[in-house]
Structure formats: structure tokens, C-alpha cells
A protein has these predicted regions:
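Hydrophobic alpha-helical membrane-insertion signals
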Residues: 1-29
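Anion-binding and metal-coordination hotspots
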Residues: 4, 66, 73-86, 96-487
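Generic alpha-helical segment signature
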Residues: 11, 24, 37, 58, ...
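Short arginine-rich
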Residues: 91-95
Length: 487
């Protein structure tokens, strides 16, 4: 029999408690039980006046509003406020009554501009939630997985301009210069002189009065701090690169935000400085991080770098570099035709150049597989930190390392997939690197807290079941009491 009473209860007046309307297993209830949000007051106390001014909005509520947005992947702050107006669980989480007015969607933006801009508040919130995970001993920092993903910026790919940008200094530049000169002196060469461009040179010559290298980059007119990123063979977008580190259990340990046109190996140091003191034994990363500088940095700090095989970039039909054997004693290379490539110089990039004799190579039967140079001279380069790269190759072939590297898809890559699928991480509505860092910090904080809350609830449920089991056997089967108490 069909019942038709859908509209009869709309005008009812009832008395109820807000707490009764939120299910006991609701995610926001679990999160609220997992952490004491009062720590936010200590973080923002210096941002508010103590003895004058109008009463402000509760800072905890102010932080919880974007937290709801990133937790549920709501596309904008405006839509988040609309959802809060009609969602009882959201109101309960924020401490609002049914008839309380929800803050305007621009409230958080104004507070960010006036109070939180140019501060590390959101990174501190991420760190505080991470400390809770450490407190429950859920994190194992012995194996750390590092990777980067790109988040599409709020910028039209057709609105851009070209500008000349100075090449940013590498984090190992000073140390590399020092070791290059030491290597040259050990080989009887003079130290390299500092580059000095003639200030009279016109810009068309590529020179600059301060001696810095320059390059032409594409800059968005909407979000100049984003970077031009090649997304595929036929698609380029403005984006931000988010580097992330996590442990083998999927807990996010740190992050850094950079323009999308900067290579992961160049921006690795900013992330590494945040996590290097947490007790890392093995650091796992993809081939983008396999550089001599990163290998040396990790090995010098006593960390085992686990980096994959990197395919040689040799042209088809030519000998690969591995076919030229390095003789460490005589410091030379031996080609497939058993001819010597002797040391020639050490260049500014830190590579030793080994060259063959053009007269000898001219009549070599393997010449077409070796070089295309007009003078028939083959040049093979070797970085001064190449021994560290060779150590990485030895580590890669150790027993068990292949299985550890395979965990990347179950850890850091899974985190990126979850963030993009459930937490609105495919693109950002924020403009500027600072706001992007806020989004990343709160998104990763809510992912860690969501996981922590569920684990605490699951653990509490198991504990309650054990207590009931113990009471049952204590009352009805006294013989088993001693055995259960010992367990």
C-alpha cells in the first residue's frame, strides 16, 4: 500500500539536542574526539588585541571552516558556507546552533589577509596534528618516500607574457665550486675564474651586468608565482609542484610548494631540510631525484638513498656510456675498441671530460657507433661525485630493496590519488604561492587527522569489545578468569 505523507511533518515543532542529531560514528565527531582544538588559541594569540576592539569570531571556528572545505573536497569557500547553512553535522562541528547565522564566505579571506598572511600558522597546524600521530606511536620514519605532484593553478594558459629570469642558484653550488677547483688542481689545472660579463654587452648577447645566467620563461599574468608545466605531449598548463614525504604507513611527514616549472631535483632541499632530523634510515624517490648532488647529500648525512634505474639518454645505434669502462687507477676510460680516453679538464658543471685521440679514432671500425664529431674525438664525462652515484647503484641491487621501492605506489602515490579524488587537490582556486601553501598544509593536516581519528575510534571499539568479553567470562565462567587477565 502506497503511503503519501511526505509533506505532513514539515511544519512540526520539536525539542531536541544538537548532539543527538549527529551520529556517533560521524567523521566530524571522530575528528573532534581525536584532538583538542584549543591549541589554535596559542598559535594566534599574538594576532589579536588583548584589551581593545570589538569581539572577534572564534579563531577555532575560523580554522575549522576551511578545514571542512578541504576535508570534503568542496570546490570553494562560498559553496562551503552554503553547505554549512543546511548541514547539522557541520554546524555541530563549528559550535553553531540551528538558528545561528553562518559567517559570510569572505570572512576567512579577510582574516587571512589581515592576520594570517606572511605567517607559518598553517604549517604549525600541520605540525601539531603530526605530533598527535607521533604521540600514538603510529609513525615509522625509518623508511621515507618522497615524490612530487602538480596542482593546476587558477590561471588561463593563454594569458601569459615572456620575461627574462635569473637562473636560481643550486643548493650545492658553493660546495661544488670548491670541489671543482680542488679536482682541477689535483690534475695540474688552474682553478676556474668567476664568470664576469662585460657590462657593455647588449641584452641580445645573453649577458648581464651581475654575471648571473639568464633564461626566458613564460609567466602567467593572473598568477605570476605559478610555473609553466608540460602536462603531456600536447598540453601545457600553469601549475604548482607539491613535494611530499610520507612513511611506509602513509602518514604525511612534510611538504613544500614550488612553481610547476622547477625540477624536483632542484627543489628537493627545501623539503629535505624539514624532515632530515626525524630519524630517516632509507629515503625512497623516483628517477627525477637521481642526481649526484642528492646522492652525495643523503650519503653524507648517513641516509641510504634508494633510487631506481635510469635509462641512458643515448641516441639509437650508438654505444651507451656503460660500454666505456672507467679505470680508477689510471683515471681514464677504455672504449669498446680498447682505446684510451684520457682526462682533459673539469668543467664548471662538475664533470670531468675524457677525450680520445681523433687520429686514432678516424680509422676505427666502430666510429659511426661512437661519435658524430667532425674531428672524430669522442668525449665521455664523469661527475666528480660519481662515486656516490655508483654507491646508489650498489644499494639498488641489495636484497629486499626492490620490494621497498615497490611500496611507492602504496604510500606516496596513493596519497596523491586520495588527495586529488577526495580533497579537491587536482586544481586550486588560490592565487599566489602563500595561499597555495595554506591549502596544501590544511589538506595534508586533514588527511592525517582523518586517518588518526578513524584509528583511535577503531582501537576504542576493540577495547570496549575486549572489556565486554572479559566481564562475560568473569561472571559466567570463573575458570577462565585467570587466563583472560593474563592476556
Amino acid at each position: 500500500m502506497m503511503t503519501q505523507n511526505a509533506d505532513k511533518k514539515r511544519e512540526q515543532i520539536q525539542m531536541f539536542c544538537m548532539d543527538d542529531l549527529v551520529p556517533q560514528d560521524h567523521l566530524l565527531r571522530l575528528i573532534d574526539q581525536a584532538i583538542d582544538w584549543s591549541f589554535i588559541y596559542d598559535l594566534v594569540i599574538d594576532k589579536y588585541s588583548a584589551d581593545n576592539g570589538r569581539p572577534s569570531m572564534d579563531p577555532v571556528m575560523l580554522i575549522k571552516i576551511p578545514f571542512i572545505q578541504y576535508l570534503y573536497g568542496i570546490r570553494s569557500m562560498r559553496q562551503t558556507v552554503k553547505e554549512i547553512e543546511v548541514n547539522v553535522a557541520y554546524r555541530w562541528f563549528l559550535g553553531l546552533e540551528m538558528m545561528d547565522k553562518v559567517p559570510h564566505f569572505s570572512t576567512f579571506g579577510k582574516n587571512y589577509t589581515r592576520r594570517f598572511k606572511d605567517t607559518d600558522l598553517f604549517e604549525q597546524i600541520f605540525s601539531r596534528i603530526l605530533q598527535e600521530c607521533y604521540k600514538y606511536r603510529l609513525i615509522d620514519p625509518s623508511e621515507v618516500f618522497v615524490d612530487a605532484t602538480h596542482v593546476k593553478a587558477r590561471a588561463n594558459s593563454k594569458k601569459m607574457r615572456k620575461r627574462i629570469a635569473d637562473e636560481e642558484a643550486l643548493f650545492f653550488e658553493e660546495q661544488l665550486k670548491k670541489e671543482i677547483n680542488e679536482d682541477r688542481e689535483a690534475h695540474g689545472k688552474k682553478p676556474l675564474k668567476e664568470k664576469k660579463e662585460d657590462p657593455k654587452d647588449p641584452p641580445s648577447c645573453g649577458g648581464s651586468s651581475d654575471g648571473k645566467e639568464e633564461k626566458t620563461v613564460k609567466e602567467s599574468t593572473t598568477d605570476p608565482e605559478s610555473g609553466w608545466f608540460r602536462k603531456g605531449e600536447h598540453k601545457n598548463v600553469f601549475a604548482y609542484s607539491v613535494q611530499t614525504a610520507c612513511d611506509k604507513n602513509g602518514w604525511i611527514l612534510g611538504y613544500s610548494v614550488n612553481p610547476g616549472n622547477q625540477h624536483d631535483s632542484r627543489t628537493f632541499k627545501s623539503l629535505y631540510d624539514k624532515i632530515k632530523d626525524i630519524g630517516i634510515q632509507t629515503l625512497v624517490a623516483d628517477a627525477g631525484y637521481k642526481t649526484p648532488a642528492i646522492a652525495k647529500l643523503l650519503l653524507d648525512d648517513g641516509i641510504t638513498p634508494l633510487l631506481p634505474y635510469k635509462r641512458p639518454m643515448t641516441k639509437d645505434g650508438f654505444f651507451k656510456k656503460a660500454e666505456y669502462v672507467y679505470d680508477e687507477y689510471f683515471d681514464c676510460y677504455v672504449c669498446p675498441n680498447d682505446q684510451v680516453l684520457a682526462y682533459h679538464t673539469t668543467n664548471r658543471s662538475g664533470y670531468r671530460e675524457y677525450k680520445s685521440c681523433g687520429i686514432v679514432c678516424e680509422g676505427c671500425p666502430y666510429l659511426k657507433q661512437c661519435t658524430e664529431s667532425r674531428d672524430h674525438v669522442k668525449v665521455v664525462t664523469r661527475h666528480i661525485w660519481e662515486p656516490h652515484m655508483e654507491k646508489c647503484e650498489d644499494i639498488r641491487h641489495m636484497i629486499g630493496m626492490k620490494e621497498v621501492y615497490a611500496q611507492r605506489k602504496e604510500t606516496v602515490e596513493r596519497l596523491f590519488g586520495t588527495a586529488k579524488e577526495n580533497h579537491g587537490f587536482r586544481y586550486t582556486q588560490m592565487i599566489g604561492k602563500a595561499r597555495m601553501e595554506m591549502k596544501v598544509g590544511l589538506t595534508f593536516a586533514c588527511m592525517n587527522l582523518k586517518k588518526l581519528a578513524k584509528m583511535i575510534a577503531r582501537k576504542g571499539k576493540r577495547g570496549a569489545q575486549k572489556c565486554l568479553l572479559l566481564i562475560k567470562y568473569t561472571l559466567f565462567e570463573p575458570k577462565t578468569r585467570k587466563t583472560l587477565l593474563e592476556c
